[in-house]
């Protein structure tokens, strides 16, 4: 078979590995190819580990449980890894892998498949699940009559397409003849208990189908090598760091309060790569908690049980419970507790619920929808009703190549007003209010889907309006530290030049030094007609297209609901106008860039 005809379906390689192999060998002549072929064969024979390198599925199928995960953050991988460890303890042979590294050619050989997958954006598969998701939906997908499977879907019920990717996998596997071990398990943001129950249930369901003759977990997991060197500080065990700076970087006349926050990681040993996020645990505002307690007529010192801990109600609401983000289940529950005709009507309409939760918090439910007389909502029932507090993720705005043990964030203070009452975002208000020396509990959340090119000479195009510019500040610090010679281009936008040009002097210095090749800005309200970054992209379309043809990597960070979609449409228009592509071919072009890791998004 010719190398140019090679695909993951006809080799033991995944598609990303195939593409990398093609790229590495494209410039070799026949003599060089022959030498490389001989060298690799000799290396493989010398290792004496050919049997060890064979896919786990080459073992008798009934002996192996394959566990695949697809997740934008590390939650899915953590659930899958914990399941693999439990399966090992029960004597099972396990193949654990990211969906992005899994060779779909193996699928028809599987007999036991357990999937953990999240949903990203508006019902979209996370980056590492896209290829498998597409394959299962295609005509190439085989019949899977010998397969037993189970799917754990991760999602956030405050979004319309809750757990959609998991639903897609479940439906498609069933349509291909596979048999479900359990009904689809849908997990909200407080997924820990449901995931733990799934672990127990699915291993019980697997037991009659497998012989426990193996006792080794085969980790076909690109992240497994990294696990050994990870910091002891995690989401479950965060590091208590010190706030060094929380400085407003928008002007006095701006209607936006954006903070530059610097945090000292001290001697924690925490390491991050540019593109990663910082998880921030926060406490709810005490004044907000007092308002809720007064509105419900509940005593602050009432004893409640949260998990295995007995604490007073006020402490539980400050430290343990989500108060600033509503979700559909809570709106529906409160509608029933209040018997409010208005809220009941809202709770029955998905779009009305979606709009309602964007502009209301739990305190608004308490203030505006009084409980009916027989609601009987006591302190313990209240904490059961509210879902657990979860950390917020912020794109890291620094490189440790420059700031060493510090980590920098760009935080927009979330502010809203409802019936004259100001409401603030939980984490953003916590960070904005933090004084020098204050403690904040943090951990690093890796994002392998938002990485600079391995070759510093590769050009990069960075599109980051508003606080979406944060990771590109980190990118530039890293590129300077690398001595990168590749061109770099930033698109930035915000309402006003004088008030909202985040990190203006830094960008100007990068331009002056030649580290940043060019910058195009869009200040939407500095003229009669609004101008956004997507307009600048179209204006510079010919040059942008040439950069892409020269191998540039393309990055987008910021708002997923509107900005990222508008920017994508602008990029498609550029490909049509300046690349001469049809609309369908333009979509395929950017899909190819994405699969080659040349088109990456960090959107939220």
From Swiss-Prot:
Catalytic reaction equation(s): hydrogen sulfide + 3 NADP(+) + 3 H2O = sulfite + 3 NADPH + 4 H(+)
One Gene Ontology MF term: sulfite reductase (NADPH) activity
Signal peptide: none
Cofactor note: Binds 1 FAD per subunit. Binds 1 FMN per subunit.
Residues in Flavodoxin-like domain copies: 65-203
Binding locations of FMN: 71-76, 118-121, 154-163
Binding-site positions, FAD: 324, 358, 392-395, 410-412, 425-428, 604
Pathway the protein contributes to: Sulfur metabolism; hydrogen sulfide biosynthesis; hydrogen sulfide from sulfite (NADPH route): step 1/1
Class of enzymatic activity (EC top level): oxidoreductase
Keyword Repeat: no
Entries under InterPro entries matching the protein: CysJ, CysJ-like_FAD-binding, CysJ_Proteobact, FAD-bd_FR_type, Flavdoxin-like, Flavodoxin/NO_synth, Flavoprot_Pyr_Nucl_cyt_Rdtase, Flavoprotein-like_sf
Gene Ontology biological process terms from the UniProt entry: cysteine biosynthetic process; hydrogen sulfide biosynthetic process; sulfate assimilation
GO cellular component: cytosol
Alphabetic keyword roster: Amino-acid biosynthesis, Cysteine biosynthesis, Electron transport, FAD, Flavoprotein, FMN, NADP, Oxidoreductase, Transport
Segments forming domain FAD-binding FR-type: 236-453
Pfam family, one: NAD_binding_1
CC cofactor: FAD; FMN
Residues given in the record as NADP(+) binding sites: 524-525, 530-534, 566
CDD domains for this protein: SiR
EC number: 1.8.1.2
Family stated for the protein in its record: Belongs to the NADPH-dependent sulphite reductase flavoprotein subunit CysJ family.
SUBUNIT field: Alpha(8)-beta(8). The alpha component is a flavoprotein, the beta component is a hemoprotein.
HAMAP family: CysJ
Biological role stated in the UniProt entry: Component of the sulfite reductase complex that catalyzes the 6-electron reduction of sulfite to sulfide. This is one of several activities required for the biosynthesis of L-cysteine from sulfate. The flavoprotein component catalyzes the electron flow from NADPH -> FAD -> FMN to the hemoprotein component.
Name of protein: Sulfite reductase [NADPH] flavoprotein alpha-component
Species name: Shewanella sp. (strain ANA-3)
